[in-house]
Amino acid sequence: MKKKYLLASLLAILAAGIYLYYFHARIYQEISKANLKSPDKNQTFLIGADMDFQKNIVYAALGDSLTAGVGVLNYEESFPYLIAGKMAQDGKKVTLKDHSIPGAKVGDLKDKLVSAAIADNPDIITILAGVNDVHGKVSLAEFKNSYGAILKRLTEETDAKIYLVSIPFIGAPSLMMPPYNLYIDWQTKKFNSVIKALAETYKAQYIDLYSPTAAQFKTNGAHYSPDLFHPSAEGYAIWAKIIYG
């Protein structure tokens, strides 16, 4: 009897593992099929240049494909550009420096982007990163160490005001099927708790993007681009409004 119970348990675990592996692979197959590209980026944009503003704000945006604007055709529809536009409307000339690598994990930002961002001598920095760590099964400890190393350098080597944007839930239900969607949601919350704690440690401002958008982004709709993972122009506009406040 015990042997039968043990065998049944092992088979159930094996079946669950195969199921999760299949849907994990399927997600990336579907995203790849959409073949979305990053919009053309000059990496530097000047917003409000035609206006007579005395103050020029340098805004450095660090992140992955979500900062690069994957899902839209023009970088002007990305959330960093939309935020820079809102700053200009408030009477500031803004130099936007895009520092993003689609597919990047936080460790990649640490190794490849931070030095360039520091060289910009920015006044404002946003970091939206971690979704690839969540999906890439990076450990919480590694994530915390890499993110902390980024913040240590930014706080020591710049005078910028730093905004840490929480990892949003992304993945339409037709792409992220249960129970994988539940697992990703659970992991996202855990990683966000690390970001929030780091914000307190390094005196950065934490912006909760997860809570006000999770319900909507757990549904299909026009807020998603064709790959059902990256936001559309409508989705990025929602994010920009929340991030800018």
Residue ranges and their predicted role:
Residues 147-151, 192:
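Generic structural signal for well-ordered alpha-helices
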Residues 170-245:
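Catalytic His-Asp segment of secreted/periplasmic serine-dependent ester chemistry enzymes
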Residues 62-64, 99-102, 128-131, 165-168, ...:
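Active-site-proximal beta-strand/loop segments in catalytic clefts of secreted hydrolases
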Residues 106-144:
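Oxyanion-hole/transition-state-stabilizing segment in secreted/luminal serine hydrolases
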Residues 157-161:
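A short helix->loop->beta-strand "cap" motif at the edges of active sites that frequently abuts
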Residues 32-100, 115-121:
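Serine-esterase "nucleophile elbow" of acetyl-processing enzymes
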